[in-house]
Amino acid sequence: MNTQRSIRTCVVGAILFAAVATACNKEDDKAVKGRTGPNGAARDTVSDLALNEDGLGQIQIGMTLDEAVNMGLLNERPDIKQACDFVFPAVGAGIPFGVNVMVVKGKVARIDVDTGTVTTEDGAKIGDSEDKIKSIYGDELKVSPHKYIEGGHYLTVMGDSASAGKAMVFETDGKQVTMFRAGRIPEVEWVEGCG
């Protein structure tokens, strides 16, 4: 009898947890209250999160970690290494799991994406074929061999941002995009992250 009651309690708890989690996710899809972009414009929805060479949503390459923490975008990291470390988006910032932010000497240097829910502002995403990336970026793309994946590539978009010292890099397995990132040169080109 106690076993049945325990099972029933667990099932009811799981259903309630799922309902709360679903409601929270729906809230994340709505406006992020009180948040503004670097130019002062309000950020309306999570759909505004498209990666480009300058950043992802309100997280901008070159902003300080303190600015991002104070805006509620990134988690505070009192233990952060001064040279280089990764920081995760703050819960409630509307940034999906799978986005990691590299901070070098206290400033956002690069943003890594390994989730299919984030695209570039040109619509490129994880799972896209190399040919699709080449068709989107054309002559702006530089192709180089992947350091660790046989047959894989780094597809680097320099474009106009190269003069500003920024780029975007797509990693592939030779067929499709497995992850991508944007940020300052040289950090965006570091294969091992901070390693």
List each model region and its residues:
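C-terminal motif of bacterial Sec signal peptides marking the signal peptidase cleavage site
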Residues: V20-A23
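Short, low-complexity, Pro/Ser/Thr/Gly-rich segments in the mature regions of secreted, periplasmic
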Residues: A182-G195
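Short, low-complexity, disordered segments immediately C-terminal to signal peptides
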Residues: N25-V46
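Second-shell loop/turn segments in exported
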Residues: N52-I59, T115-A124
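Post-signal-peptide N-terminal segment of Sec-exported extracytoplasmic proteins
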Residues: D44, L49-E76
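Bacterial N-terminal signal peptides that target proteins for export
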Residues: N2-V11
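A cross-family detector of function-defining hotspots
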Residues: V32-K33, T64-V104, E130-Q176, A182
